[in-house]
Amino acid sequence: MWLWEDQGGLLGPFSFVLVLLLVVTRSPFNACVLTGSLYILLRFFSFEPVPSRRALQVLKPRDRVSAIAHRGGSHDAPENTLAAIRQAAKNGATGVELDIEFTSDGVPVLMHDNTVDRTTDGSGRLCDLTFEQVRKLNPAANHRLRNEFPDERIPTLKEAVTECLRHNLTIFFDVKGHADMASAALKNIYTEFPQLYNNSMVCSFLPEVIYKMRQTDQKVITALTHRPWSLSHTGDGKPRYSVFWKQSVFVVLDILLDWSMHNVLWYLCGISAFLMQKDFVSPDYLKKWSAKGIQVVSWTVNTFDEKNYYESHLGSSYITDSMLEDCAPHF
């Protein structure tokens, strides 16, 4: 039965909801009616995941653990550039993770941040810059190997896809926001390059992005990305807010988000994979998701010992900043 937890179902989460509603309403009848209504709504609005065979073509091509170059391999080349894609292929990556953002005139380009300050010789918010302005920036300007990549430009989504396909790399499209724009842009890309249906996936920290993508095209393989405590703490573990009450509110929101991700949102979106920050991944964690028919991909795995552990012991694909050497994580 799909309902049972050990078969990847929803018995555990809905039992929790039922108990919670019993406490709140103090009425078994009302609690049962509300729980049943929530269940019906979830079933009605949820999407079926793509067939697991297709998902495994992307997550474990040739039935092997995949090493995915984060932002194209941001330690080995300027992140989110065509040079990074070429370098990732040269260094033996199975695929690349690429970040999608939009210029002020709606052109989808590769960029992780919402500003251009960190990676380029320019400044300002990407959404305030036209594509013509963005094209003049140097995305290698602040990279440690900038002298080796003197002629790079910020690529469009189409240019990046063309380069990846040329090198037979799988693609993890990481969508930073703009659910409607991103799903429309990606739908156009999948229409133009139909081989992407068996060679790529769309992932995001934002469930609304993944849900919108599934609404737009249910054939696209998708994944939710998650890091526990991401609302209340930065990537290196520091609190985001100095005011106690504000920090406490976001801690509570983190707890709710984490519960929702693991118990409801994965089912609602019909995902095929869950991209989890590596510090929270264990054999039991992989087993839990495997019972749901979902693959776990860990990020960011940046040391030789960690990679060996994922490949030899866990048998789990991972995302890394470097295909060549140990390096610090890029958040």
From Swiss-Prot:
Tree of life domain: Eukaryota
Record family assignment: Belongs to the glycerophosphoryl diester phosphodiesterase family.
Protein name in the entry: Glycerophosphodiester phosphodiesterase 1
Glycosylated residues in this chain: N168
Subunit structure, interactors included: Interacts with PRAF2. Interacts with RGS16.
Tissue: Widely expressed. Highly expressed in the brain and spinal cord, followed by kidney, liver, and testis. In contrast, little or no expression is detected in the heart or spleen.
Domain GP-PDE: 65-331
Annotated Gene Ontology cellular component terms: cytoplasmic vesicle membrane; membrane; plasma membrane
